[in-house]
Amino acid sequence: MGEQQLDQVTSDELIYVPASECRRLLDARLPPHTAAEAFASVARINTLYMIARAWSGHLGTSFSSLDIMSWLFLNEMRDLDRGPGACDIFFSSKGHDAPGLYSVLVGLGLLPEEKMDNLRRLGGLPGHPHVETPYIQANTGSLGMGVSKAKGMAIANRLAGHPRRIFVLTGDGELQEGQFWESLASAARQRLGEIVVIIDHNKIQSDTWVEQVGDLGDLAAKLRAFGWHVSRCDGHDVGAIDGVFRALDGIADQPKVVVADTVKGKGVSFMEGPSMKAGDLYAYHSGAPTETEYANASMELLDRARGLFAASGLGALATKSARRPARREPRVTQNLISAYRDALVIQADRHPHLVVLDADLVKDCGLVPFAQKYPDRFVECGIAEQDMVSMACGLARRGALPVAHSFACFLSARPNEQIYNQCSEGSKVIYVGSLAGLLPGGPGHSHQSVRDIGALGSVPKLLLAEPAVESEVHALLEYLVDTEAESSYLRLVSVKWPVPFDYPAGQHVQPGQGWVVRDGRDLVVIGYGPWLLSNAWHAAEELQSNFGLTTRLINLPWLNRVDPAWLKEAIGDCRVVQLMDNHYVRGGQGEMLAAAIAELGLDPVTSVARVGVTELPECGTNDEVLAYHGLDVASLVDAFRAVVRRHSSGTVSQLA
């Protein structure tokens, strides 16, 4: 489930195989096994190319599934030439393997070759599947949805009189999600034999072994108990894959599942799961290869593909080269995850009843040092957020202080009812949602958590907070552990960001109150978080230097609570207020503040404008995404000037 961000490395030469070579391979009418094996070898080269060029993606799970996807699209999927609305259906429920699927679609001519240059770019191929892309049949989000979606598709197809086979690829870590098991029984009862689920059983979830998190036990027996026909094969042996599907041809009235034993990172020796040393975390779940890793990986993949082409009588494999765009990271940045990592251990040292729970994101959430220092107080719950939250509820009821972690997009949504239930009991749990907000933009909307404030902000006895700088991480966590009596949600931006201001010396944490980042008299701007406030700070600089307008920029780290007296004092005599959200405008902090300002009854009336996300988040580089959604520096300058102009012209709005 992780989303690792890479630091600066130099540009380097990348190699890909043009789609014309795949067409040459398919036109040669080779035996199906030979063609599929060669096609998959090319798809791995192009998957590596896309992820390296994009600077992020999921190599390990793409590589483990490519032999399966290649066989399905070359030999099982019917009527592909009739378009995505008329052919058999394939989609990945795990979603991380999107680059692998794109490489297959490009190789078949179902996506333009130039799309490979635009993985995780605005207007390009999204980091996770999105139905706006041709032949992508379902979006992904929290894991475990795939079989349920397939059932709905099967019933709709039957009602329309257009039955189609439906192939669903899942991960093995995904089987820890309860929805997967909920979805099985009714499929068997309804005899949905057109559904075939393939489990990419690569034995590794995110960064560690599945058996160390939630051992699947006798998986085949469990699946059979739900009424499914179960087969098993080597997921990298196209002959074995073919044999399994031919055996399934005669089974019409029973849903089918194929357990495909695979290797995460298959095709590159040092990326393959079995190469992990005992105790290590798997290094190639997310992120992108370094220059050296790319050179070594591409050499292995090219050697294999060239050998397969030559052995098939196709001659030399044609390739093309391109340069990986330079990615330059600022040298001095605020890293809130690293700060949280350190702050958590400090609090654990002081509070022996503090217990940490994780939902398969130990590295991304900064939990490795805690897990190493306090293994008895660390609970890895796997990809099972609802179970994790209810476990935290039980811990809290018996006197422990649970701190539960996941990405904000998952922690706020999937276990929302469990969080509400826990808070209703009056116990204390600290929830920590990382990867919060619009950035990073590369993973796409399924991971861009821009609705968590709205989802959790109305829960009684739950305080929401977001730090802007590393020092504030320490201060807020200490307050939430030591002082806050009720439950809380700490929202953490994961991207590193250069922040042009510091946490004020001697600043005391007061719920509902913030602090002035820079002072001014013409406009009050209130926001939170590192990149949002930093962009506003730079916008304020431009306003002052270019237009003579000064801005009072305020950091309010409390997302669902404001002290009215403090707010009135913070606004002062200024009657122009701009509210900012790293979140949907609807349901964000700005909505709460706009209502609070209206209730202050200021005279003369204050002009209030809001800026934030107003539509489904776009996928792209961070700069592209910020500009698209109007949250980059230039857009904020325009927004700030606009609200000042409206107020000056007498156009007063409290909900602009």
Language model features by range: what are they?
Residues G2-F167, R306-R491, K496-W497, G506-H508, ...:
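Thiamine diphosphate
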Residues T170:
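Short hydrophobic beta-strand that contains or immediately precedes a catalytic carboxylate
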